């Protein structure tokens, strides 16, 4: 080891550690983001499936004669249509609305149906209140 290497040892080790940290951060960041997205998508689609099941149940022939369901029939059909058109892939064309806009329409329509039927459809607490960031 010559004198110049000795004097720059700390600087070289710092740079090497910094570069290694950047690479590890990029690698782990993608993995964490993927898992975070997967978890939140699962929760939202699970709730969408539950709402869809309730809507299908209410729209059945024997249930559709109930006065409250008769009153909410049009809204139930619209909610069912929204749930059936919910995007299930990440490749959306520019003209298509994204998942969040569909989700906002679904929750708004579910609230209308909920008030008309006098039953709770959505959970009381917000599903993504803090989006995982505390």
Swiss-Prot record:
Pfam families: Yae1_N. Residues 17-53 are annotated as: deca-GX3 motif. InterPro entries: Essential_protein_Yae1_N, LTO1_adapter. It comes from the Eukaryota. Keywords: Cytoplasm, Nucleus. It is found in: Cytoplasm; Nucleus. The keyword Nucleus applies. One of its GO terms (biological process) is protein maturation. Coiled coil: none annotated. GO terms for cellular component: cytosol; nucleus. May form a complex with YAE1. Belongs to the LTO1 family. The complex LTO1:YAE1 may function as a target specific adapter that probably recruits apo-RPLI1 to the cytosolic iron-sulfur protein assembly (CIA) complex machinery. May be required for biogenesis of the large ribosomal subunit and initiation of translation. This is LTO1 family protein C191.08.
